[in-house]
Amino acid sequence: MNKSKRPFTKSKRSFRRRLPPIQSGDRIDYRNMSLISRFISEQGKILSRRVNRVTLKQQRLITMAIKQARILSLLPFLNNQKQFERSESTPRTTSLRTRKK
């Protein structure tokens, strides 16, 4: 078949490349809390390399920095602050718990 007469040709769309999360000037260090906190989930877990969109070497450095910051108590190991919302506080009723004799 002739190349000029292809029935299904897809047009090449241009796409914007995402900016890398770590710039070349950023230093991956346990003291750089603004950088480290971007790679931790709300539960306090280290996000995966696929989610972070970083290279393998950068992910290893981030992981080591996070673990060092946790050991030095700059970061919590778990971020499990459960927030319960109550619309109205109701007092406990003790009259329902009467013993029958």
Swiss-Prot record:
The record's Gene Ontology cellular component field reads:
chloroplast; mitochondrial small ribosomal subunit
Primary localization class, coarse: plastid
What InterPro entries does the record point to?
A: Ribosomal_bS18, Ribosomal_bS18_CS, Ribosomal_bS18_sf
Q: SUPFAM superfamilies annotated for this entry? A: Ribosomal protein S18
- Name a single GO biological process: translation
Top-level lineage group? Eukaryota
Q: Where is this region: Disordered?
A: 1-20
Q: Which UniProt keywords apply?
A: Chloroplast, Plastid, Ribonucleoprotein, Ribosomal protein, RNA-binding, rRNA-binding
Q: Where does this polypeptide localize?
A: Plastid, Chloroplast
Instruction: Mark out the compositionally biased spans (Basic residues).
Output: 1-19
Q: Which Pfam families match?
A: Ribosomal_S18
Please list the coiled coil stretches: none
Which GO molecular function terms does the record list? small ribosomal subunit rRNA binding; structural constituent of ribosome
Q: How does it assemble?
A: Part of the 30S ribosomal subunit.
Q: Which NCBIfam families match?
A: S18
* Family recorded in the similarity comment: Belongs to the bacterial ribosomal protein bS18 family.
Q: What is this protein called?
A: Small ribosomal subunit protein bS18c
Organism encoding this protein: Arabis hirsuta (Hairy rock-cress)
Could you read off the lineage of the organism from its UniProt record? Eukaryota, Viridiplantae, Streptophyta, Embryophyta, Tracheophyta
Q: Which gene encodes it?
A: rps18
